[in-house]
Structures are given as structure tokens and as C-alpha cells.
Curated annotation (Swiss-Prot):
Protein name: Anaerobic nitric oxide reductase flavorubredoxin
Gene name of the encoded protein: norV
Residues that coordinate or bind Fe cation 3: C431, C434, C464, C467
Binding site for Fe cation 1: H79, E81, H147, D166
Primary location: cytoplasm
């Protein structure tokens, strides 16, 4: 069934209430989606995009009810991905000579999917126009990497409608087409989820591209997206949101997510959260177990947050697989203006937290100190977790928090004595396999090696707490080997 968008513009797309996975299984479409295609009927008849390939036959059948396919003058493909151009093969079987207007990159993508280089392609660039009669034109604007190299937008003069492709859309299915007809809270949530999980890597391109489009000084009375609602009520509100989200966005929010084998890392997460809210009751704190939570919800919360704490148990001396996968996704999303800290519980070997810290730093996060607990955290260990949360709350505060009472400090002469004593303990030693460092001043209490024990007095049965290898793999720490 078609819907009148405005004047001679019809929506001829397809709702998909059942879809729950997008881009393979990488994006959960919990509210379904729609594949928006538009038919413009002026002196020339124009089709803007098609629908997902799984609805190809239905799409062509429905389009026949609106127009004799032979009367279709032009096809515009804003984006060659299969959820936009998937029905092209079915359609072109009926009208093989119809001109297709798209970017040069789109021709490569379309041929890669459909394998019909003989189709009647016409390459367009930013500023190119196509006269469709009745005093109206289509103006094309290339938008490479928002979010594919082939992407573009199309503007219809006279009606002042911007066919925006993936930008400003959302995976959101509703029987109503327009933004003022649907639940506003749901709509906003799905818009932000869409931006956070799909467009965040390209945030640096969003602002200049929007500025370029606004520079045309064209009125925009509607924004017709490729997924979700058409923006007709205050359509530029979503443009303003994109500019906000693209500008190193953060809220006063901290996200904690973790995976755990024996519930120990969960206990740490809860205690850290308690410490944060104890010091800063105003900050929003959300905790997710990655094994039981929607991945895209977690990533959306990370996008919204000023910082993230990531927890993992140690398995085979590395982090849990679901944590590793999610951190890899965060690396690809290239979040900006975020801080991070790693934490986790381990048994005989604890390499995961250090590995996780390195991965988070590689992903572009500004790192704070990490936190480890051996085995199941006891009362003292949980207090350390709460203190870690208190420290994080102060370090990550967007504005200064009330200063806590100062802790009692040792007398200066005591500090001097302690420093002198530390100097007599000999060098720190580093494991040549996993780079764990033995500090004589700290010892290794978990193996009954007390603080203040020089390396020469460490028992021969000592094992590296990270990789479980013996003393023979340790060397003097490079910074001290002079």
C-alpha cells in the first residue's frame, strides 16, 4: 500500500516487522525496520531506491499497482546496499533500459551485487541536477562514507524534500510514516541507537557534510529517510541532533560491562558502581553482563557515556571471548572523548586485565588505573573495588565534586626512611614472557612473599602470577638495568 508523502510523492516501500538482525547479526533491530522507497510523479516519473532483496517480488507487484512500469522514466539509487537496491534485478527484468542515476562508486557496488554491467547507468556528482518537469529538479549530493563510499542524498526542489539515504534514519517499524505520529521516546532512542552503532565511526565527516548541504541554502520541509519515519514536523531537529552527536558527544554517565565465569567479576562491578554513586549521586551508572544483554544497547550506552569500566575474568591467560569481541567493535566504532578502566578477577593467572587495558587504549580511550582481584573478592577486596569507584567518580567528574576529608599522611622523616629502605631492596624484576613486574616493595602476598622482600630472597618455587612460569624467566627491569 502506498502512502502520500507530499503532493506527487508516494511512499512505496516495505515494512519489516519481523527482522531482528541487520548487517548479519551485528545489529539487533528490536523494533523491526522499514525499507523506504519513493515514487515521484511529475512530468517525469522517478523511483528513489527500492527495498531489501527478500521483498523483491512483492515490491515490483506493489509498484505495478501505482504505475505502469514502462512509464517509469528514471531510477535513482542513493545507496547500493542490498536493503536499498536489493530489488533492482527483479525490477530491471521488466524495464531493462531504464536509466539509473547514482554515484560512480555505486556502479561498482551495484555490479558487485547484481552482475549487470549492461544496465543504463548515469554517474552523478554533487551539484548535478535532473529536470523532472513541472518546474522541479532533483539535485544530487554525494555523501561518501555516510556510511558507504557510494552514498548520496537527493533533494527535490519545489517540494523541498531531502531524500537523505541512511542519514537521519532509524531501524524502527510503525504503521505510521511520519515522525509526529509515533512514540517520541521510542523514536529518539532508535535514532540514537542507529547513530551510535552505525554512523559513529564517521562522526568527523558528519559535521562538514551537513555544513556543505546547509550551504546550498535550500529550504528543507521534509526529510525522507531510507529507514524508519519521514521527518515532516520540524524536520531539522534530527539534523541538530546529528551535529550534537558528532561533536565528541558525552553525557554525565558511566557504563560498566563485564563477563564472568564464577560471579566474582560481577561482585567487583557492583562494588565499583556503589563507590561511584557514593561520591557522585548525580551520575548515571548502568551495568551490563555482556552474556545477558543486547550488545547494541551496551554500545549505545558507551556512546552516551563519559567513561566505561570493562570487566573480565581470565580464561587461558586472556580475556573472555565476548569481552574481546565487544572491545574489537568499540575499536571499529572509534568512540571519542571517552575514558576507560579495566578490572577483573582471576585465579592462578591474571593476564586478562592487562591485556584488556592495552586493547582499550588501542581503541582510543583515555585510560585510568586498572583493578584486579584474586579468586572471589572478600570484604577487603570489595572495599578496594568501592574505593576504585570513588576514585573514578572524582577523576571522571565533569565538574568538581566536594572534596573528601584528607587522609592522614606519614611524617616527612617516615617517608624518607621508607624511601631509603625501598632503595636497599634491590631492583624490580620483569617476567620475560608476560612482562609482569615484581616490585620488592610490594612483594607478592598471594604467594606469601611479603612487602620488602628483595628478589634474592624470593623462594625458588615462586611462580609469575600472570603466566605461572618460574623465577628463571625473570630479568632485571629494563629501566633499572643500567
Amino acid at each position: 500500500m502506498s502512502i502520500v508523502v507530499k503532493n506527487n510523492i508516494l511512499w512505496v516501500g516495505q515494512r519489516d516487522w519481523e527482522v531482528r538482525d541487520f548487517h548479519g547479526t551485528e545489529y539487533k533491530t528490536l523494533r523491526g525496520s522499514s525499507y523506504n522507497s519513493y515514487l515521484i510523479r511529475e512530468e517525469k516519473n522517478v523511483l528513489i531506491d527500492t527495498v531489501d532483496h527478500k521483498f523483491s517480488r512483492e515490491f515490483v507487484q506493489n509498484l505495478r499497482r501505482e504505475i505502469d512500469l514502462a512509464d517509469l522514466d528514471y531510477i535513482v539509487i542513493n545507496h547500493a546496499e542490498e536493503d536499498h537496491a536489493g530489488a533492482l534485478t527483479e525490477l530491471m527484468m521488466q524495464i531493462p533500459d531504464t536509466p539509473i542515476y547514482c554515484t560512480a562508486n555505486a556502479i561498482d557496488s551495484i555490479n558487485g551485487h547484481h552482475h549487470h554491467p549492461e544496465w543504463n547507468f548515469h554517474v552523478v556528482k554533487t551539484g548535478d541536477t535532473l529536470d523532472i518537469g513541472n518546474g522541479k529538479q532533483l539535485i544530487f549530493v554525494e555523501t561518501p562514507m555516510l556510511h558507504w563510499p557510494d552514498s548520496m542524498m537527493t533533494y527535490l526542489t519545489g517540494d523541498a524534500v531531502l531524500f537523505s539515504n541512511d542519514a537521519f534514519g532509524q531501524h524502527y517499524c510503525d504503521e505510521h510514516l511520519f515522525n509526529d505520529e509515533v512514540d517520541q521516546t521510542e523514536l529518539y532512542e532508535q535514532c540514537q541507537r542507529y547513530y551510535a552503532n552505525i554512523l559513529t565511526p564517521f562522526s568527523r565527516l558528519v559535521t562538514p557534510k551537513i555544513t556543505e548541504i546547509l550551504g546550498f541554502n535550500l529550504p528543507v520541509e521534509m526529510i525522507a529517510t531510507s529507514h524508519g519515519v519521514v521527518w515532516r514536523d520540524n524536520p531539522t531537529q534530527i539534523v541538530e541532533k546529528y551535529l550534537e552527536w558528532a561533536a565528541d558527544y558525552q553525557e554525565d554517565r558511566i557504563t560498566i560491562f563485564y563477563d564472568t565465569m564464577s560471579n566474582n567479576t560481577r561482585m567487583m562491578a557492583d562494588a565499583i558502581a556503589q563507590g561511584i554513586t557514593e561520591v557522585d549521586p548525580q551520575v548515571a551508572v548502568k551495568i551490563f553482563n555482556v552474556a545477558r544483554s543486547d550488545k547494541n544497547d551496551i554500545l549505545t550506552n558507551v556512546f552516551r557515556s563519559k567513561g566505561v569500566l570493562v570487566g573480565t575474568s581470565t580464561m587461558n591467560n586472556v580475556m573472555m571471548p565476548k569481552i574481546a569481541g565487544l572491545v574489537e567493535e568499540m575499536t571499529g566504532l572509534r568512540f571519542r572523548n571517552k575514558r576507560a578502566s579495566a578490572f577483573g578477577s582471576h585465579g592462578w593467572s591474571g593476564g586478562a586485565v592487562d591485556r584488556l587495558s592495552t586493547r582499550l587504549q588501542d581503541a582510543g580511550f583515555e585510560m585510568s588505573l586498572s583493578l584486579k582481584a584474586k579468586w572471589r573478592p572478600d570484604i577487603d577486596a570489595l572495599e578496594l573495588c568501592r574505593q576504585h569507584g570513588r576514585d573514578i567518580a572524582r577523576q571522571w567528574a565533569l565538574s568538581p565534586l566536594p572534596v573528601a576529608e584528607a587522609a592522614t599522611t606519614p611524617e616527612p622523616q617516615d617517608c624518607a626512611c621508607a624511601a631509603a629502605a625501598a632503595a636497599d631492596l634491590g631492583p624490580m624484576m620483569q617476567c620475560s614472557v608476560c612482562q609482569w613486574v615484581y616490585d620488592p616493595a610490594k612483594g607478592e602476598p598471594n604467594q606469601d612473599v611479603q612487602p620488602g622482600t628483595p628478589w634474592s630472597e624470593v623462594p625458588d618455587n615462586f611462580l609469575c602470577p600472570e603466566c605461572s612460569l618460574g623465577k628463571d624467566v625473570f630479568d632485571v627491569l629494563a629501566t633499572e638495568a643500567k
